[in-house]
Amino acid sequence: MKNITDMEKDRQYMKMALELAQKGMGFTAPNPMVGAVIVKNEKIIGQGYHRKYGELHAEREALAACTEQPEGASMYVTLEPCCHYGKQPPCVNAILESGIRRVIVGSSDPNPLVAGKGIRILKDHGIEVTENF
């Protein structure tokens, strides 16, 4: 079980991801606004948000912005990572390839193409997932 200090850190990083997501307001429709923060050894090594419809999703932008290898890191993302091909490839694939060990998800994705499948794929590959944070 996590201690209060760890939970507070998780809340702070998720708050940062939510603030990043808001930067996409007015540009992402019909997609949702999403933010992501990657933390390794209590240091932010990458962050991103979905800037515009058709462009990189928040998870891929955060991974591209990493200042060091994300292997073993935690990702805080406001919405469940996608697991289907659309304008962008599945974000779950990028997360799996990156070596991230833990994903904290703010909300599950109600889109029927995702709807829990992204979380299930991550868990099936041994990634620790905290849902609906």
Regions found by a protein language model. Give the residues of each.
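Short, compositionally biased leader-like segments
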Residues: 1-16, 126-129
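Zn2+-dependent cytidine deaminase-like catalytic core
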Residues: 38-133
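Short N-terminal amphipathic alpha-helix/helix-capping patch enriched in small hydrophobics
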Residues: 30-32, 58-59
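Acidic, glycine-enriched active-site microenvironments
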Residues: 31-34, 71
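Short, basic/aromatic recognition patches
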Residues: 9-29
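Non-catalytic interface/targeting segments
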Residues: 1, 18, 29-30, 39-40
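Short, N-terminal intrinsically disordered low-complexity segments that are rich in Pro/Gly
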Residues: 6-7, 23-27, 48-52, 56
